[in-house]
Amino acid sequence: MSKRKAPQETLNGGITDMLTELANFEKNVNQAIHKYNAYRKAASVIAKYPHKIKSGAEAKKLPGVGTKIAEKIDEFLATGKLRKLEKIRQDDTSSSINFLTRVSGIGPSAARKFVDEGIKTLEDLRKNEDKLNHHQRIGLKYFEDFEKRIPREEMLQMQDIVLSEVKKVDSEYIATVCGSFRRGAESSGDMDVLLTHPSFTSESAKQPKLLHRVVEQLQKVRFITDTLSKGETKFMGVCQLPSKNDEKEYPHRRIDIRLIPKDQYYCGVLYFTGSDIFNKNMRAHALEKGFTINEYTIRPLGVTGVAGEPLPVDSEKDIFDYIQWKYREPKDRSE
């Protein structure tokens, strides 16, 4: 998944950018995930609001916008800035940690460690490459590329390459590009591919070759350019669209490919399509109906609250049907 949300280009872009910056600060510096989620939810709701927000009171009528966030919106609308953010930006340690976490492979803990050692900028990282692991070096190498959003038009071209090459390896493979792209987003942060094969189930032995054969094919056609990590069920790497007729080079992009057992595939597709907030709402509804859902299975809950055996699932719609919830197309899941 992408490291950072791009600035919003909406009616209330200033407000959503402010909330996203606060969210990143809470996650990366304070490691306060509940506050991170609260700011993100508010930003997501406001991004879809069809009118220009004129006050915190107006924003507060929206789900997920509480009193404290409404007060921050009032301050931002009145002054064009937020004292809390100004303070964060002026604090060298906070701003440096926040910045370094934008490098793929550098999480909040690693960023804090680097800052404690006086490593605060890209230039500092380049001078201290011996202190970086393989993933972080690749993240540094392609930092500028990874910062760029991927336009939907490019994502569609990337999808065409992946799906066609997968079928060349074996026509029985099933692959789905998930994330915000599947929900119809105009741009994406990275490419998230789920992969399965009828011969691989949760009962069968591990079959890493099913994943590795696909990765090797995508390397052979020079779509995958770098490997960050390659396990038995997950590949993390870098890809690039081929340039046409000596046109300018396309940026390098992050790609993850996950191999999922066939019987767990559609629970995985549902989970990795998102959005996070939609998934939380769906899980809450499932619990009310006596089921528990995660990225692997849907299981009934007994009277004692203990989950039973996984239920058979052959499509996303099956999961909606079990919990008696009206099916929603991926484009309607961006909550």
Curated annotation (Swiss-Prot):
In this chain, a 2'-deoxyribonucleoside 5'-triphosphate is annotated as bound at: R149, S180, R183, G189, D190
**EC assignment:** 2.7.7.7, 4.2.99.-, 4.2.99.18
Record: residues binding Mg(2+) 1: D190, D192
Q: Which residues carry this modification: N6-acetyllysine?
A: K72
Q: A Gene Ontology biological process annotation?
A: DNA-templated DNA replication
Q: Which residues carry this modification: Omega-N-methylarginine?
A: R83, R152
Give the GO molecular function terms.
Answer: 5'-deoxyribose-5-phosphate lyase activity; class I DNA-(apurinic or apyrimidinic site) endonuclease activity; DNA binding; DNA-directed DNA polymerase activity; lyase activity; metal ion binding
What GO CC annotations are associated with the protein? cytoplasm; nucleus
Cofactor names from the entry are:
Mg(2+)
The answer to whether keyword Magnesium applies is: yes
Where it mainly occurs, coarsely classed, is nucleus
Q: Which family does it belong to?
A: Belongs to the DNA polymerase type-X family.
Oligomeric state and interaction partners are given as: Monomer. Binds single-stranded DNA (ssDNA). Interacts with APEX1, LIG1, LIG3, FEN1, PCNA and XRCC1. Interacts with HUWE1/ARF-BP1, STUB1/CHIP and USP47. Interacts with FAM168A.
Identify this protein by name: DNA polymerase beta
